[in-house]
A protein has these predicted regions:
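Conserved nucleic-acid-binding Ia/Ib motif block in the N-terminal RecA-like helicase ATPase lobe
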Residues: 1-20, 24-25, 102, 143, ...
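Conserved motor-coupling elements within RecA-like helicase/translocase cores
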Residues: 1-20, 30-36, 160-177
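Conserved ATPase-coupling elements of RecA-like P-loop NTPase cores
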Residues: 5, 28-34, 44-59, 163, ...
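Amphipathic alpha-helical segments that mediate coupling or scaffolding at interfaces
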Residues: 11, 24, 55-58, 79, ...
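Conserved Walker B
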Residues: 17, 24-26, 43-45, 183-184, ...
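Structural recognition of the conserved hydrophobic beta-strand(s) that form the central parallel beta-sheet
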Residues: 19-22, 40, 63-69, 78-79, ...
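Post-DEXD/H (motif II) to motif III coupling segment of the RecA-like Helicase ATP-binding lobe
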Residues: 33-38, 44-124
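C-terminal helicase module of SF1/SF2 nucleic-acid helicases/translocases
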Residues: 108-126, 130, 134-137, 141, ...
Length: 291
């Protein structure tokens, strides 16, 4: 629905098209479907309960397939409880290697070593700094630390054309270090980028770190992920648990394992409500089934 949205909407309502691929625009009230039979939700963890229920309400008997590398606690709990069917794709693409993951306290020496090693083998680097207010200062620091690096900045508050140019420069290797926010979490596939450094990884969620880590290692080259943190005393206990789990789960296809740990850390959410994480207090699965 990104191109010619009005024409696409009319075609869907009239049944003139068999497949409609869209963003959240499909949730608009003006979108109607003549005979909706199958709904596929990609990156399911990025949708809220209300959004998913809105999609289901488009037709009472629609078949729904949700896809995600890391199911949110509520969805995983429903699958493990037998309320939803679950299938796991555990076989990685050919020649893919697991991403070596390191959790370290941030030092200039570590940052310089990680970036320099990637650049020396002709690769590219993502440097995640999820604070727009200070991202330009961070980019300048990296440029001063590694003068040979060609550094660009990308974040969601940039003008669309400016951001497109940045991503084009990085994709075509006119730049080799992208200092960015979590805007790269999905939809980015650059095989030559095989090192990602996440500053203040303790502030990121478990599924989010896994998604971000998946931006590298998309070819046959060994990829590296550095999760930079402050002193452990500054971090919350849940943050420490998340980082321990993510550093241990390096194997390809580890998303399901991470999701089960996320379920343990955050809780299962509400079966009848809108919370997608959190510990149930008023009702459990057994009582729900009896109801």
């Amino acid at each position: 629905c990104a191109q010619r949205p009005a024409r696409s909407a009319r075609a869907a309502a009239a049944g003139d098209v068999d497949i409609v691929i869209g963003t959240h625009a499909l949730l608009q009230d003006k979108m109607t479907f003549k005979d909706l039979g199958l709904l596929i939700i990609d990156e399911e963890h990025r949708f809220g309960v209300r959004q998913k229920e809105k999609l289901k309400s488009l037709r009472s008997e629609v078949d729904i397939l949700t896809l995600t590398a890391t199911p949110i606690p509520r969805t995983l709990n429903m699958a493990m409880s037998g309320m939803r069917d679950l299938s796991i794709i555990a076989t990685p693409p050919a020649r893919r290697l697991s991403i070596r993951t390191f959790v370290r306290q941030r030092t200039e020496g570590l940052v310089k070593e990680a970036i320099t090693r990637e650049l020396m083998r002709g690769g590219q680097v993502y440097y995640l700094h999820n604070e727009v207010q200070t991202i330009e200062n961070t980019a300048r620091e990296i440029a001063q630390l590694i003068p040979e690096a060609r550094v660009v900045i990308g974040h969601g508050q940039m003008r669309e054309r400016q951001l497109e140019k940045v991503m084009s420069d990085f994709y075509h290797k006119r730049a080799n270090v992208l200092v960015c926010t979590t805007i790269i979490e999905t939809g980015i596939d650059i095989p030559s980028a095989n090192t990602i450094i996440m500053n203040r990884a303790d502030k990121l969620g478990l599924a989010q770190v896994h998604q971000l880590r998946g931006r590298v290692g998309r070819s046959h080259h060994q990829a590296y992920a550095y999760l930079l943190t402050p002193h452990p005393k500054v971090m919350t206990s849940d943050a420490v648990k998340r980082l321990d789990v993510i550093s241990d789960a390096e194997d390809l296809g580890a998303g399901y394992i991470l999701a089960t740990h996320d379920l343990e850390i955050r809780g299962a959410g509400e079966l009848l409500g809108e919370e997608q994480s959190g510990h149930l207090q008023a009702i459990g699965y057994s009582l729900f089934m009896e109801l």
